[in-house]
């Protein structure tokens, strides 16, 4: 019987065989990288919760456009969570739905919200950087490419939040209603 050669990007652990017969070839994901990417679901879903809570707080202080911006961004974070789930499904890995933590809501003003949101995005960016590093460490190139995609999104989000902080600083925090009128989610 002729030996079956698999493409280099398909690891042997991703092949299910019955004797010499290949039953299924699934895209490989290293088990240690899988654990990290599973955590990405929680990171993104927690982000959605945080931004939804921030939007609710901003509504309570009558900054309706900014509240809408944060609630729209919460939906964007849920979309990112779905990307992580879909990536795992495409790898024939069952995505594990995490428990979502109640966000801390100790904001006292808009500045606290903006600062907290930016710091949270830095945290998420660090997570995806570490995930990309681990994927490379285990030569899991598909996972690495996925992590790079998530990092591209993170760069965009850091720019968005940085822009909000710049707008806030231009208004010196005094003209919050004028600030609020200029906030629109892309």
Language-model features: where?
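Iron-associated oxidoreductase/ferritin-like identity signal
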Residues: 1-186
